[in-house]
Regions:
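ATP-dependent adenylate-handling active sites, centered on carboxylate activation for C-N bond formation
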Residues: 1-112, 128, 151-168
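Short Ser/Thr-interspersed hydrophobic loop/turn segments at strand-loop and sheet-helix junctions
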Residues: 137-151
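A short, charged helix-loop
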Residues: 109-122
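Short, flexible segments with low predicted structural confidence
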Residues: 112, 124-126, 141-144
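Structural motif
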Residues: 1-3, 123-136
Length: 168
């Protein structure tokens, strides 16, 4: 099951279909209006990257990663990463090297890192929170959020509309 939230969404759609044929969804609002904590954190990192040179951030992150837990450790570790690396760390349980250790055969398809980094590369001049929103709108929102909502509602003959994403 790609996303466990599909189960309650299925039953919610099934129940709604008993009463209505069309529902409105808030899908896309968090991505559009910056509603995820990750976007706020991206703003903190943007400020950090303005004030601290990259080599120093990378060094601080590498050193912090080897130390026992302390307040601010994770900020320093993530602060030593590029925005796309922080994005990957926040969205995937296993990074590519870790995934490969669990698999019997090598991964031959495009890795999530390559796929996501491509979208960051498309918008290099934007601030980090806006980059995160852009990437989410072109990946997570399309291939997870909207896909599962559409499938679960269609499985129950329910039309789902997403007004926040309507261009009109």
């Amino acid at each position: 099951l790609p996303n466990p939230s599909e189960i309650p969404l299925y039953f919610l759609a099934k129940n709604a279909r008993q009463y209505v044929k069309v529902v409105l969804s808030g899908e896309g609002a968090d991505e559009l209006f910056g509603g995820y904590p990750m976007y706020l954190q991206g703003g903190h990192f943007a400020e950090y990257t303005k004030r601290v040179p990259r080599p120093l951030r990378k060094m601080a992150g590498a050193v912090a990663g080897k130390l026992p837990e302390f307040k601010g450790k994770h900020f320093l570790v993530r602060g030593g990463m590029e925005p796309w690396q922080r994005f990957m760390r926040a969205n995937y349980v296993f990074q590519s090297g870790e995934r490969q250790r669990f698999l019997k055969r090598p991964i031959t398809s495009k890795l999530p890192e390559e796929y996501s980094k491509r979208y960051f590369d498309e918008v290099p001049g934007l601030d980090e929170p806006t980059q995160l929103q852009y990437v989410d709108m072109h990946t997570w929102m399309i291939y997870d959020i909207l896909l599962k909502a559409d499938r679960m509602s269609m499985a129950n003959s329910l039309e789902l509309r997403v007004p926040f994403l309507d261009k009109e």
